[in-house]
């Protein structure tokens, strides 16, 4: 995975420094970034997933320069935000199929196979006909992971991975991350994660 961050700064228009001279080398594998609310974790995450521009500094993800190669980075990146949203009109299968189409899977047979395999991997195959917004909290989280992984990204970034999950679902979710992704960056304010 290798993420390299050099002299990264983010200063908001009001003058607040969200990030100041951040230098970090994130190796391949699981990596957690732990810190209290307001420490800049979410700002750093938004920059890494190309949702926010840094004020200055350099970021490389798998050899791609974030400022010059955003399209390439989006192609290798899976992202699961803390407050993942589902389209109420889609069933679980349809939602994941839509994500697969957006990721560039154009052949119906290839897409169906990828969606079926991913639903099986995350334990949602039996509820594929249920509307996504009617799933339990843990099931929604797993569907979010499936959506982030459907295009087989090299890197997955997860914000507050177990927020809102009961203890049993937390364990299942952590195990799922270990099973389906070799390269995972977790942002959390919960040391248990």
Residue ranges of predicted features:
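Conserved small/polar residues in nucleotide/adenosyl-binding loops
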Residues: 187-193
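Catalytic Walker B motif of ABC-type/P-loop ATPase nucleotide-binding domains
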Residues: 156-159
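Conserved ABC ATPase signature
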Residues: 131-135
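Conserved catalytic motifs of ABC-family nucleotide-binding domains
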Residues: 152
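Helical segment within the ABC ATPase nucleotide-binding domain
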Residues: 171-183
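Conserved ABC ATPase "signature" region
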Residues: 97, 101-104, 109-127
């Amino acid at each position: 995975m290798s993420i390299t961050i050099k002299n990264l700064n983010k200063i908001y228009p009001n003058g607040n420094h969200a990030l100041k001279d951040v230098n970090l080398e994130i190796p391949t594998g699981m990596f957690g970034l732990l810190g209290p609310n307001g420490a800049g974790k979410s700002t750093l995450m938004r920059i890494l997933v190309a949702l926010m521009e840094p004020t200055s500094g350099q970021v490389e993800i798998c050899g791609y320069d974030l400022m010059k190669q955003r399209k390439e980075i989006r192609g290798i990146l899976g992202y699961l935000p803390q407050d993942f949203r589902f389209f109420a009109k889609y069933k679980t299968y349809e939602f994941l199929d839509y994500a697969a189409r957006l990721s560039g899977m154009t052949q119906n047979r290839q897409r169906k196979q990828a969606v079926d395999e991913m639903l099986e991997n995350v334990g949602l195959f039996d509820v594929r006909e249920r509307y996504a917004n009617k799933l339990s909290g843990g099931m929604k989280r797993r569907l979010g992971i499936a959506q982030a992984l459907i295009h087989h990204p090299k890197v997955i970034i997860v914000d507050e991975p177990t927020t809102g999950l009961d203890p049993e679902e937390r364990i299942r979710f952590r195990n799922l991350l270990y099973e389906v992704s070799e390269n995972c960056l977790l942002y959390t304010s919960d040391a248990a994660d």
